[in-house]
Amino acid sequence: MAPAFLLLLLLWPQGCVSGPSADSVYTKVRLLEGETLSVQCSYKGYKNRVEGKVWCKIRKKKCEPGFARVWVKGPRYLLQDDAQAKVVNITMVALKLQDSGRYWCMRNTSGILYPLMGFQLDVSPAPQTERNIPFTHLDNILKSGTVTTGQAPTSGPDAPFTTGVMVFTPGLITLPRLLASTRPASKTGYSFTATSTTSQGPRRTMGSQTVTASPSNARDSSAGPESISTKSGDLSTRSPTTGLCLTSRSLLNRLPSMPSIRHQDVYSTVLGVVLTLLVLMLIMVYGFWKKRHMASYSMCSDPSTRDPPGRPEPYVEVYLI
């Protein structure tokens, strides 16, 4: 009865008890979303006999061993009892904000729970890093400007060798010589992320790089190669860039109207005029033909124009002697 009364005092609201705060009996643990909780409960001061161990969460002033964690595949938590060291190891993986709260590690003796150790778990949201932000906005960023990329030159035995893999969304790739008649005057700022591997001597580092250029530093693509500064750890590299460009629809909209479109308009106009003249010529030919045909018909039908009836030829008889 005494242990049950002790547990009731521990779970009682702070305003109803005098003395030290109820929070002082909990060990505070602060973790981020996605991390793993790993705590230990010791029972060295108790008799060495086989007892069950329970990990429960406080809900409505009650300790519930069957609290739910529906987002976890597999067991909700892992409890390992080391009887020789008299230590209970509790592990909870894939923490979420819903896991925040108060937990108790208890002994189960003949169906009665005895508290061993309490924990106050605070789970905070994981901060958004610069690594995943460009991937969600990369498509919108690349649609509004021209991106030039290049590789840093290497020289000397101690010069760093940098390789990069850049992620671009599908778009229109245009070489500068295809747009010789069009020269963009300005470029919109852009940002992209490159996963790079840098090695210098025996050291080898991997990291994520974010490169950003502002519109004020942009120049004409035909003025010469540009340079982009990248930084990974304590290594800074300044590299020239090549002329392969990703252009947007706004650049193509500035292009002058193509000659083929003008030729199509002229061809349509000429075709209409020719067809109209052809119809007029057919009407005129039909009129002349009809006029001649009606004139010849009237001459044939007039009785005055017919030949007079011929007289009968004289009858001549010839006798042979």
From Swiss-Prot:
Location within or outside the cell: Cell membrane
Induction trigger: Induced in CD4 T-cells by concanavalin-A.
Tissue localization of expression: Detected in cultured B-cells, T-cell leukemia and monocyte leukemia. Expressed constitutively on CD8 T-cells and induced on CD4 T-cells after activation.
Ranges of the Cytoplasmic topological domain: 290-321
GO MF annotations, alphabetized: signaling receptor activity
Residues of this chain annotated as glycosylated in UniProt: 89
GO CC entries: cell surface; plasma membrane
Region Disordered, residue ranges: 189-241
UniProt signal peptide: 1-18
Compositionally biased tracts (Polar residues): 189-220, 227-241
InterPro entries recorded: Ig-like_dom (IPR007110), Ig-like_dom_sf (IPR036179), Ig-like_fold (IPR013783), Immune_rcpt_domain (IPR052314)
Job of this protein: Cell surface receptor that may play a role in the innate and adaptive immune response. Acts as a counter-receptor for CD276 and interaction with CD276 on T-cells enhances T-cell activation.
Alphabetical list of PANTHER family matching this protein: TREM-LIKE TRANSCRIPT 2 PROTEIN (PTHR16423:SF3), TREM-LIKE TRANSCRIPT PROTEIN (PTHR16423)
Subunit relationships: Interacts with CD276 and this interaction enhances T-cell activation.
Protein name: Trem-like transcript 2 protein
Record gene name: TREML2
